[in-house]
Curated annotation (Swiss-Prot):
This is Kunitz-type trypsin inhibitor alpha chain. Inhibition of trypsin. Heterodimer of an alpha and a beta chain linked by a disulfide bond. PROSITE patterns: SOYBEAN_KUNITZ. Pfam families: Kunitz_legume.
Length: 137
């Protein structure tokens, strides 16, 4: 089965996409925000406005394959056109913090091998899941 974007195009390994809710009126895309005393926005959150697409994200699988399929282990990394000064020391690659279970961005020295995120079919759309040691969270 192929994963398709909102334009009906096949998801490409390393492609840049906006991650949006499946239904209108449920908020916007994903972006970064400051939480819990952070001095820079490091937490992945959903934009409140449905007209805000959020930040573009690169979705890639470590194996060098052209097309992303359901269940592949994926890394996700924001790729803003103009990163802020706060993010020059960050990779913008997603990681899940064990204690809080929040999705954050990684500092450069922690940046590789975080996944595994997966895209799974869900009803007529897809859901993004985090898997740790084969367990869905």
């Amino acid at each position: 089965q192929e994963l398709l974007d909102v334009d009906g195009e096949i998801l490409r390994n390393g492609g840049s996409y906006y991650i949006l809710p499946a239904f209108r009126g449920k908020g916007g895309g994903l972006e970064l925000a400051k939480t819990e005393g952070e001095t820079c926005p490091l937490t992945v959150v959903q934009a409140r406005s449905e007209t805000d697409r959020g930040l573009p994200a690169s979705i890639w699988s470590p194996p060098r394959i052209a097309i992303i399929r359901p269940g592949f282990s994926l890394n996700i990394e924001f790729r803003p056109r103009n990163p802020s000064a706060c993010h020059r020391e960050s990779s913008l690659q997603w990681k899940v913090e064990e204690e809080s279970q929040q999705v954050k961005i990684a500092v450069k020295e922690d940046a590789r091998g975080f996944g595994p995120f997966r895209i799974r079919p869900h009803r007529d759309d897809y859901k993004l899941v985090y898997c740790d040691e084969g367990q869905k969270r």
